[in-house]
């Protein structure tokens, strides 16, 4: 999309969704075609600048602004390239490769959060008031640092939401602002709708019970429990799914719909070895 990085990235993700649908329908050729198109996000990545950059209609790069990727509405709407550039949910390994590898990407992602204000209100870095970044705290899980997902989701839950009038950090926007909180406070959230994977993070509550609808689920309830939960205990030390040790930082949608229980042991310090499988 000439001039628009945000739309180019969203179209690439949409093509990936279509490839998944086509695969499920048995349309192999269409699935392969749309999967290949979903890799088009790389065409708006400028290796010289080390980040996504809009192109002109003739394929040349648009002039790079003095503020760089922090320039408001340069190649996107109501945001900047630093915020929009993390939207490759369907190919995070490929995105990280473009950005210089996992270690460099992780450092840049950490910088993205460390420079934002404590209330996460409108700013040039992680801006929770604007929904395009809502999946970004969970990218730490995908990059091999789940303790940072745990830290930042707890910080956002505490800093961007208040139990008062105007308690949301931004416009509700069709329920997304509240939906993010509900899922994150329960301890799981999707990064890539179209996948059945949910990223795990630290629940806010000692116990949550989800009643399942028997029209769609095999189970009746999915229970989330924590041991050692406290305001400062934002780090997962270990987890169990239906009584068995869980070493992954994610679960599948079917784990919820089958019913059962997931439990977390929490502490005020990170466990750098949990969730790396």
Task: State what each model feature region is.
Residues 215-217, 231, 246, 269-271:
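Generic "edge-of-domain/loop-turn" microfeature
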Residues 232-238:
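Beta-strand-rich binding/interaction modules
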């Amino acid at each position: 999309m000439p001039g628009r990085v945000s739309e180019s990235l969203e179209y690439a993700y949409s093509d990936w969704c279509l490839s998944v649908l086509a695969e499920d329908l048995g349309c192999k050729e269409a699935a392969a075609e749309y999967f290949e198109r979903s890799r088009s996000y790389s065409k708006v990545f400028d290796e010289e600048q080390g980040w996504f950059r809009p192109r002109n209609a003739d394929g040349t790069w648009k002039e790079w602004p003095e503020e760089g990727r922090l320039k408001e509405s340069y190649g996107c709407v109501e945001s900047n390239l630093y915020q929009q550039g993390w939207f490759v949910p369907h190919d995070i390994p490929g995105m990280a490769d473009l950005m210089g590898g996992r270690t460099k990407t992780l450092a840049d992602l950490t910088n993205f959060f460390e420079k934002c204000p404590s209330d996460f209100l409108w700013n040039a870095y992680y801006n929770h008031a604007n929904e395009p970044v809502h999946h970004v705290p969970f990218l730490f899980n995908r990059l091999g640092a789940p303790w940072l997902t745990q830290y930042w989701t707890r910080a956002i839950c505490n800093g961007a939401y208040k139990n008062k009038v105007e308690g949301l950090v931004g416009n509700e926007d069709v329920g997304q602002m509240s939906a993010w909180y509900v899922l994150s406070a329960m301890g799981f959230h999707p990064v890539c709708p179209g996948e059945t994977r949910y990223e795990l993070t630290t629940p806010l509550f000692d116990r949550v019970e989800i009643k399942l609808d028997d029209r769609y689920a095999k189970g009746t309830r999915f229970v989330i429990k924590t041991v050692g939960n406290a305001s400062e205990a934002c780090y997962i030390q270990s987890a169990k799914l239906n009584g068995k040790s869980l070493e992954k930082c994610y679960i599948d949608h079917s784990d919820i719909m089958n019913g059962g229980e997931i439990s977390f042991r929490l502490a005020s310090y990170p466990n750098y070895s949990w969730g790396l499988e």
